[in-house]
Amino acid sequence: MVKLTSIAAGVAAIAATASATTTLAQSDERVNLVELGVYVSDIRAHLAQYYMFQAAHPTETYPVEVAEAVFNYGDFTTMLTGIAPDQVTRMITGVPWYSSRLKPAISSALSKVGIYTIAN
């Protein structure tokens, strides 16, 4: 599985337009791409858990781009552009392990690329 650090490095190029300590809105596309990178990495690392969650919550849908990114082990960051910020938030916060696993990983990944967020 792809490590979080490699995902963070992959999206660093997109976030490169941000300075070392840039503060951005949570809905900024650069923030969303880092979040989605962590999310895709987490799905890859815990695929069975996501399948079980999907089976238990069939109305929780994901954009096709996320599924393609999960199974495409190349550079997927360009696939994830254009996903609406509210949809990113819904997907990421909608899983039971958001607080315990995703939120800390997202905070770490954002920090590594020098992005800090403010509420919209």
From Swiss-Prot:
CC per GO annotation: fungal-type cell wall; fungal-type vacuole
PROSITE patterns linked to this entry: SRP1_TIP1 (PS00724)
Pfam families: SRP1_TIP1
Sorted UniProt keywords: Signal
Listed InterPro entries: SRP1_TIP1, Yeast_SRP1/TIP1_CWP
Molecular functions per Gene Ontology: structural constituent of cell wall
Residues annotated as signal peptide: 1-20
Keyword Lipid biosynthesis carried by entry: no
Keyword Hydrolase: no
Similarity field: Belongs to the SRP1/TIP1 family. Seripauperin subfamily.
PANTHER family: CELL WALL PROTEIN CWP1-RELATED (PTHR31002:SF34), SERIPAUPERIN (PTHR31002)
Listed name of the protein: Seripauperin-10
